[in-house]
Amino acid sequence: MNKIKALLLLLVAFIALPTLAQQLPTLPVDKDVRIGKLPNGLTYYIRHNNLPENRANFYIAQKVGAVQEEESQRGLAHFLEHMCFNGTNNFPGDALTKFCERIGVKFGQNLNAYTSTDETVYNIDDVPVTESNVDSCLLILHDW
């Protein structure tokens, strides 16, 4: 009888254990990160980095992944991720990849995306900082 009680107590402890992980304090936000919200609801984070010099990285994370899909929609978020590289409103056909490669951003290495269970993230990394390049990369993020 004592073994059953001990086993039951152990089982309850293991079931309750994950709730402790939920009580961890939130991570502090880097004081150098500028955070804002656009009228359309998009939250943005901007941080200056000295290295690599005169280079910028652009990311857009969308709360879209397998968890939000219905059974009839399985794989849709991942499919749309791939389609974004096949042309957008402002970069039809392969113009997006051609633009990026022309400025030294390599497809697959510096220009990429992934879809997980709860997010889809697109990135353009190691972009040479010029007004034109920054404007074009922001336009790409807009299209995605």
Task: Please annotate each region the language model reported.
Residues 3, 18-19:
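Acidic, low-complexity intrinsically disordered regions
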Residues 7, 25, 30, 83, ...:
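Short, functionally important structural connectors and interaction interfaces within domains
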Residues 12, 34, 72-75:
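Hydrophobic/aromatic side chains embedded in well-ordered alpha-helices
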Residues 26-60:
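Mature N-terminal segment immediately following signal peptide/propeptide cleavage
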